[in-house]
Amino acid sequence: MSTVVQFWDYIDGVCVINLDHRTDRWQELCKQLTHVPAGKIHRISATWGKMLPDYKQGPYFAGCTEEESLFWAGRAGCLLSHRRCVQYAKDHQWERVLILEDDAVFHDSLSGDIGQMLVEVMQEQSYWQMFFLGSTPYYPLASPVKQINTPHGEVTAARIMGPLCAHCYIVHASAYDDMLNDLPTEENVWEWQATHLSYDSWIANEFGRVAKRTILGCYPNLCSQGLYYSDIEHHEIQHGIGALGQDSWPVTFVDAATFAKIFHSPRFLLKKWMKLAAHAALGWYYRWCGYRKFTVSIESAGYWGALKAALAALKKR
């Protein structure tokens, strides 16, 4: 008879990204984690983007408004903080680390049936890299691997493409080296960010769109982001859509074979390389004109719409 392993026993460590001055967020999150062994919770001092070398200097900040400078500093600090968590997990030789942003809001304690299902998924998947317990889907198809009925409705764990939002996810040790090699350090963060834009954009468009990697996610989200003042957007923001007890994000479930074929389909590959080319072009734009904070994106306006917005912004400068 197999031994039942609880979720919080299966996770080797929990890294919580928290800016030193945001003690309010740290205290609120700790209230949600009282059932987690205290020795597993590790506060990771977040990088304050405004304190990075070359902030508001060099070509990337040419002509930037204060709002734009703060926005990109927030993004840089965020991605370096996530990189620090991965490095921390590797240094401690953890096999599985749960990484949390300090605005995470759990909709289940993960101490019962849902948590047990998550453990079974991780045990049964012979090779996986990331498991998102909360995210914004970036691709409309997913392949279910396990489902469970709960008082709040059905919860499905599925193989997904890299999503957006990174407030609650598990990283397996098999991903540490690739992530650390690809993510920037303080020395090259401004250059890296010009092309890759942000941490979750890199996951959605690059790291999580490779056939050899297995990215997992949950429908609906087991963890969302609470209403707090955002140190990136610089206003109150909340990402609570698709949470447990609500309608899940729209998704079409397909079988494993169909999902695997997607990575090799001409349409998928064309869109992937078009997106990478668009990001490369945007990187050159930032090098020539400095960072900008556009009101539209490729995702919301399409390639032509985003190009027109960029040209309009360029004319104003």
Labelled PLM ranges:
Residues 1-100, 104-317:
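An acidic/histidine-cluster motif and surrounding catalytic segment
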